[in-house]
Amino acid sequence: MILIDGKSLSKDLKERLVTQVQEYKHHTAITPKLVAIIVGNDPASKTYVDSKEKACAQVGIDSQVITLPEHTTESELLELIDQLNNDSSVHAILVQLPLPAHINKNNVIYSIKPEKDVDGFHPTNVGRLQLRDKKCLESCTPKGIMTMLREYGIKTEGAYAVVVGASNVVGKPVSQLLLNAKATVTTCHRFTTDLKSHTTKADILIVAVGKPNFITADMVKEGAVVIDVGINHVDGKIVGDVDFAAVKDKVAAITPVPGGVGPMTITELLYNTFQCAQELNR
């Protein structure tokens, strides 16, 4: 069994990016810059953004965090985003989710300039993903999953891939990326009947449902590759959506939780920020 070590791979990829960013800054005198916006005082949001800010510093990317009070109106937030859209020194914009209930998430996502949409959530980038447009900014977690498969030499062409979970953030975009990579893809969701009949056929199984230890050994094919996107808190520990202890001896390769997909998400955010800077300054 191969352990797909996202933490180690993430470290290697960041080291590669350091060199690329240094060369870019030397040739253009431009420093890529990410601006992250938090609305309210959600502790988890602050933790996520702090880790992103730290990662930016590690690779030579500038970052700025703008924290707005909980009572910020939607129009005030949209006005700020408009200012950042028109600021040539800002290359990437991230609005940390969730937002307070009085702010329409879609209105906010749609207001970000597609070329600065570092999360890849804007409809333009969703469409570009479908069309395999090279200018597409891909969502960070799905992009990280595909990078893991590629870096570990896991063949997608002709493989049967099953994605459990159909969210806009992970399930749908990773299904499209797998399709773009010439896999045959089935996307399962809460209305899928007889889930096991699908998962036991998968050469590549990707799980993102937010249910601890949801995928058990009897649901996985011998020799499959399993990517666990889940992050669940159980009895003071972080566990995935896959019963790792039961599944690991049956599969060819598997990601751990923690230390699997999570670190890759932040690393791909850095790569997307760099891509934004390059595209905006061509």
From Swiss-Prot:
Function in brief: Catalyzes the oxidation of 5,10-methylenetetrahydrofolate to 5,10-methenyltetrahydrofolate and then the hydrolysis of 5,10-methenyltetrahydrofolate to 10-formyltetrahydrofolate.
Subunit annotation: Homodimer.
Name this protein carries in UniProt: Bifunctional protein FolD
An example Gene Ontology CC term for this record: cytosol
One of the GO biological process terms: L-histidine biosynthetic process
Keyword match Hydrolase: yes
GO molecular function: methenyltetrahydrofolate cyclohydrolase activity; methylenetetrahydrofolate dehydrogenase (NADP+) activity
Family statement drawn from the similarity comment of this UniProt entry: Belongs to the tetrahydrofolate dehydrogenase/cyclohydrolase family.
Residues annotated as signal peptide: none
Catalytic reaction equation(s): (6R)-5,10-methylene-5,6,7,8-tetrahydrofolate + NADP(+) = (6R)-5,10-methenyltetrahydrofolate + NADPH; (6R)-5,10-methenyltetrahydrofolate + H2O = (6R)-10-formyltetrahydrofolate + H(+)
Keywords associated with the record: Amino-acid biosynthesis, Histidine biosynthesis, Hydrolase, Methionine biosynthesis, Multifunctional enzyme, NADP, One-carbon metabolism, Oxidoreductase, Purine biosynthesis
Residues reported in the UniProt entry to bind NADP(+): G165, A166, S167, I231
InterPro entries named in the record: Aminoacid_DH-like_N_sf (IPR046346), NAD(P)-bd_dom_sf (IPR036291), THF_DH/CycHdrlase (IPR000672), THF_DH/CycHdrlase_cat_dom (IPR020630), THF_DH/CycHdrlase_CS (IPR020867), THF_DH/CycHdrlase_NAD-bd_dom (IPR020631)
Source organism, top-level taxon: Bacteria
Pathway annotation: One-carbon metabolism; tetrahydrofolate interconversion
Species the sequence originates in: Francisella tularensis subsp. mediasiatica (strain FSC147)
EC annotation from Swiss-Prot or TrEMBL: 1.5.1.5, 3.5.4.9
